[in-house]
């Protein structure tokens, strides 16, 4: 996906390709995009709600990097993994129109990288997630949780499972962000597992999910339940 960035009066705008960007990310009116600047040519992306405090990772559905073209600024690559200790920007989405005024950015200084807004320290791995039985916690998983976890509300946790033949079974309609044609049903079992069914085969094939893959789902509710996913 190609977009063009333009800088006017100290603010950055997506001046071309905004409509495609919104469709690809599943961005909704009132939500925010946080860009963490890694280098002059690379940035990471996080999605926030209207209050800026429900922090939701934005993962490109293709699992590939999104490249952008420059316009009065250097070209950038949008990565699918946020990383701390870098400068950041925030884009507020107010409509679906493909105009630069819809994508104005501002500095982000109210979201710390190693503590929450109340000044509490970074949460431990055990405090950040539940791991299903028989799920091996690899260094990659721990690293992922340590990076993403800082953007969770303190009441939120990850639930990590290893995909198996009985995991995908449920009853609430969900959509993959950026892929409205892929819908599934979500169901919560008596032992608190969340399972998916109907449409799962198509979704798994699209995202290269196989038996024994470890997947991290990010569920959020725009008004409809949507998900983004990482496959480790």
Curated annotation (Swiss-Prot):
Residues 95-107 have a biased composition (Basic and acidic residues). Signal peptide: none annotated. One of its GO terms (cellular component) is nucleus. Residues 1-51, 140-232 bind DNA. One of its GO terms (molecular function) is DNA binding. Keywords: DNA-binding, Nucleus, Repeat, Transcription, Transcription regulation. InterPro entries: B3_DNA-bd, DNA-bd_pseudobarrel_sf, Plant_B3_domain. Residues 108-121 have a biased composition (Polar residues). Its main location: nucleus. It is found in: Nucleus. The keyword Repeat applies. Residues 92-121 are annotated as: Disordered. SUPFAM superfamilies: DNA-binding pseudobarrel domain (SSF101936). PANTHER family: B3 DOMAIN-CONTAINING (PTHR31920), B3 DOMAIN-CONTAINING PROTEIN REM23 (PTHR31920:SF122). This is Putative B3 domain-containing protein Os11g0242900.
């Amino acid at each position: 996906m190609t977009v063009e960035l333009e800088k006017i009066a100290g603010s950055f705008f997506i001046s071309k390709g905004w409509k495609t960007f919104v469709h690809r990310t599943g961005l909704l009116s009132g939500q925010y995009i946080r860009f963490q600047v890694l280098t002059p040519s690379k940035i990471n992306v996080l999605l926030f709600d209207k209050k800026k405090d429900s922090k939701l990772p934005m993962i490109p559905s293709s699992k590939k990097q999104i490249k952008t073209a420059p316009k009065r600024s250097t070209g950038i690559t949008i990565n699918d993994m946020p990383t701390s200790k870098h400068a950041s920007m925030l884009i507020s989405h107010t409509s679906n129109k493909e105009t630069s005024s819809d994508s104005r950015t501002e500095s982000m200084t109210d979201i710390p990288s190693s503590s929450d807004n109340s000044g509490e320290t970074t949460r431990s791995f055990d405090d950040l997630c539940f791991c299903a039985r028989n799920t091996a916690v690899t260094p990659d998983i721990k690293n992922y949780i340590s990076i993403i976890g800082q953007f969770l509300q303190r009441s939120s946790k990850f639930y990590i499972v290893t995909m198996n033949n009985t995991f995908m079974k449920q009853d609430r309609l969900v959509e993959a962000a950026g892929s409205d044609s892929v819908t599934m049903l979500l169901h919560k079992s008596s032992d608190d597992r969340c399972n998916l069914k109907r449409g799962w085969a198509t979704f798994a094939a699209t995202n290269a999910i196989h038996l024994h893959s470890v997947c991290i789902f990010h569920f959020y509710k725009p008004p409809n339940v949507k998900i983004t996913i990482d496959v480790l």
